[in-house]
Amino acid sequence: MGKGLVTAGWQVRGTTRDPGNAEDILGARLEAVVADPDRAASILDQVGDVTLVFWLLGSALGEPEVIAAIHGPRLEGLMQKLVDTPVRGFVYEAAGRVQRRHLERGAEIVREAAERWRIPVQVVTEDPGDWEAWTEAMLTATERLIGGARRGAAG
């Protein structure tokens, strides 16, 4: 998805919890940053010049309590803090290998934040196992949040 956004003319910052994955992010022509969704401050430190935040953790791996937290209280805390940043939208991945109840709770938190704080959000339920359809759904969510056609598109 990051490559698709870069191709469309956007600057994209990719994050990883594992510094060893930074080279893969750089190889996709993205800015690479180490940040941990279990530590909201590490995410918030990166959003000063960001238009959209993508919470692409539908297939996250880790300890069950950490997975529950990043789709629950950590996500909720992040949404509360995003209100005071320049971020103009949030995309939540509500599909993947994570237990459905966690994804449903995360989607609920994101929708509640949209209602409470008027944060524009998109909840994407496309299966990441279908890479092309998932990528298209993510790009469509991006367009909905920023309005208008994809950057760099003819027309």
Model-derived features: positions:
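Short, charged/polar "capping" segments at the starts of alpha-helices
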Residues: 20-24, 98-103, 131
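Anion (oxyanion) recognition and catalysis
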Residues: 6, 26, 111, 115
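Alpha-helical elements of Rossmann-like donor-binding domains used by nucleotide-donor carbohydrate transfer enzymes
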Residues: 42, 77, 109, 137-141
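NAD(P)H-binding glycine-rich loop region in Rossmannoid oxidoreductase-like domains
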Residues: 14, 19-76, 81
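Conserved beta-strand segments of alpha/beta enzyme cores
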Residues: 11, 31, 120-123
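N-terminal Rossmann NAD(P)H-binding glycine-rich loop of SDR-like oxidoreductase domains
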Residues: 1-10
